A protein has these predicted regions:
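Alpha-helical transmembrane segments of multi-pass small-molecule/ion transporters
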Residues: 1-308
Length: 308
């Protein structure tokens, strides 16, 4: 457990530092938005390409992807049960479904790298290659189908995926690894420099994006569905993973990815597609804080299973 806390505490500290810098106005909101854009377009793709290109995969990671995707689909479907919550509006249902299927890639990459080095980074990157498209498609359809707005042009989730640089980075990295193409030294070192900046800046930006004021507006619905997400996704991943023979490091990485809080950009997507943006902000704040408690519990399960 001490090794996990050694990896988790720096992540929490950087998220807290980002919140402090934003709250005090020491770094303007525009600067963090620019950092988000830089990370999305350049830094994270560089990290993913390098991690995947230098990885050596056997059959286990593909079983890992199957468990993660199946868990996303099942927990997304479970979100439909929110319609039985008294007084709930349709946009909130779409937002709950989105919360259930999205995950924080930056925190996953941070923990995977700190705990397991390059192999951990590669496995988390591979998980991202599968989970990001699934999360985007489910989220867009859920938000649009539950939105209360005049009929008009419907967003096209598949088109949105073609504009996502993280997807291209995953495809490039997997292609390089599949064909055993080694990156030239100069290219590898350049990507390494960009990758080193990706996680630190991403965690600072994630902290800046947490609206602590949202916790004051949060109620039973927010905390109930936050716990469903933080406990439910890793639990379903574990059951499916064990059923299909997942074990060892891939199992540990799958559980870590599933146990991260919902994605910070879920607020923007909810706002743009007619979801309940206020509830999305509540989920981000509540899950980011609760994950500091649930992630160590997940690690305890990993140790109990002897996965690492």
């Amino acid at each position: 457990m001490s090794a996990f806390l050694t990896a988790l505490v720096p992540v929490i500290l950087l998220v807290a530092l980002g919140q402090f810098l934003a709250k005090r106005g020491l770094v303007p909101a525009e600067a963090f938005r620019a950092l988000d854009r830089l990370s999305f377009l350049v830094l994270l793709p560089a990290l993913i390409i390098r991690a995947l290109a230098n990885a050596e995969f056997d059959g286990a990671p593909w079983v890992m992807l199957g468990a993660l995707i199946a868990a996303q689909v099942l927990l997304g479907a479970f979100g439909l049960s929110a319609r039985f919550w008294p007084g709930i509006a349709p946009p909130a249902i779409g937002t709950i479904i989105q919360s259930n299927v999205r995950w924080n890639t930056i925190i996953g990459l941070s923990l995977g790298g700190l705990l397991f080095g390059d192999e951990g980074l590669a496995l988390v990157s591979l998980a991202a290659a599968a989970m990001i498209p699934v999360a985007n498609v489910i989220s867009v359809y859920a938000l649009v189908s539950h939105a209360e707005r005049p009929p008009g042009d419907k967003p096209r989730p598949l088109l949105a995926l073609t504009r996502n640089p993280l997807i291209y980075a995953c495809l490039i990295g997997i292609a390089l690894a599949s064909f055993h193409v080694r990156l030239p030294v100069i290219a590898d070192e350049s990507l390494k420099m960009l990758a080193n900046a990706a996680i630190a800046l991403g965690l600072l930006s994630a902290g800046a994006g947490v609206d602590l004021g949202a916790l004051q507006r949060a109620g039973l619905r927010t905390f109930t569905w936050s716990l469903v997400r933080l406990i439910g996704l890793p639990a379903v991943t574990l059951v499916i993973g064990l059923a299909i023979g997942l074990s060892g490091l891939p199992l540990a990485i799958a559980l870590i990815c599933a146990a991260t809080p919902t994605a910070p950009n879920s607020y923007v997507l909810a706002r743009e597609l007619g979801g309940d943006a206020g509830l999305a902000a509540n989920f981000i704040a509540a899950q980011t804080l609760l994950a500091a408690l649930t992630l160590p519990l997940t690690w305890g399960v990993i140790l109990w299973l002897g996965a690492v």
